[in-house]
Structures are given as structure tokens and as C-alpha cells.
Amino acid sequence: MTPALSPSRASDFMQCPLLYRFRVIDRLPEPPSAAAARGTLVHAALERVFDLPAPERTPEATVALLPGEWARLVEEEPELASLLTGPVAGATSPGEAIVAETDADRERAWLEEAAGFVRTWFTLEDPRRLEPAERELYVEAEVDGLVLRGYVDRLDVAPDGRLRVVDYKTGRSPSEQWEGKALFQMKFYALVLWRTRGVVPTLLQLVYLRDGEV
């Protein structure tokens, strides 16, 4: 079997080879991450909104997609439901947690937090004026005996054939010290697209939804 590598796993290896071993070779189980789940939820809504006719791609319509997308994610990965259950921070007893906050309250707060990222996106881009060529595009290419693969959040193609690769980030925009990790991921995608399409992307665009920066 030809070895395969995604940008996130390549980043793991560069950051810490032992972390790479735990995740890829030993496959040690990891509990669900609230940050990762929130990112997946927001990404899903920003992907699905383009199924709507352009005039209907509003902030309200996109936020309305969140409950259904969250239900779908939980159905696919039931362990995600554990992120919205259990004692609240600061509660002195399980009973107090139940009084202080129910699971329904947690879900409403969770969805509202995700909605904040969606609303920020609309201050940066207008989906009514966009028609992506691809969304959540799986890309794969073999380079020097190694399969490089991953998912591109959005691929825009201009009438003259120029490519723009867009990646949504729900974390904070990194300092210069850590910016290289995000740029590495984009260069990874650019290499794979060049190998598969014969075109080097003209623009690699990171969209930071927490800070509202591009």
C-alpha cells in the first residue's frame, strides 16, 4: 500500500514526530474536541449555503442550517453528543449542573456560538456573488511515491481559468511565529492541485472567522 499523508498529519510530524506516531501509526483514540467539532459544524453550514439560490444566501438562512447540520454530525459520530452533556464549569455537584444548565441550553449556546462565526463570514464575503467551482473538494496526488491527499474547503475558478483556494479557519489568526503552519497547509493543497489539474492556484486565501480577517 502506498503511504498517504494529509496536511494535518504532515504538520503533526513537523511539530512532533511522536505526536504523528501516536495518531497515525499507533492510532491512539482521542476524545472529541469541542473546537474541532465547532469548526466542522461551521464548515458544513458554509458549504451547504451554496445549495440555495444566490438571492437566498443570507446570514439568517445560513444560521438556520446549523441545527440540521449539527444533528447530522451527531448521527454520524454519536460521541460528539458528549460535548454538550455533563456538569457545567464551576458547578459544585451534578444536581446543581442540571439546575444551572440543561443539555438543551447547552445546545442553544453551542449553536449560537457557531452562528457568530457564520455572521462574521458575511462581513468578509458575500455568497450571493460567489459560485464556487468546488466545495469540500477531495484532492489526491502521488508525489515521489507518497500519496498527498486532503479536502479543500472551497475552490473558485475565474472565467480565465485562474484558481483561488479558500480555507475557513475558526481558530484565531496566528502570530507570525505560527503563521507558517497555516501557509504550509495551503501550499500543500496548491501542490496537489497543480499535480492533478496542471494549474498553479493564483490565490491561496485563509479566512479567519473568529477574528474576521482574510
What are these regions (language model features)?
Residues A45-R135:
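A non-catalytic, helix-rich entry segment at domain boundaries
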Residues D26-A35, D51-R57, S175-W178:
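Short, polar/flexible loop-turn hinges at active-site or ligand-entry regions and domain interfaces
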Residues A34, R38, V42, W110, ...:
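Hydrophobic (often cysteine-bearing) scaffold residues that line and stabilize catalytic clefts
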Residues M1-A36:
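C-terminal, charged and often intrinsically disordered regions of DNA end-processing helicases
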Residues C16, V42-H43, A114, R154, ...:
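A residue-level signal for conserved active-site and pocket-lining positions in enzyme catalytic cores
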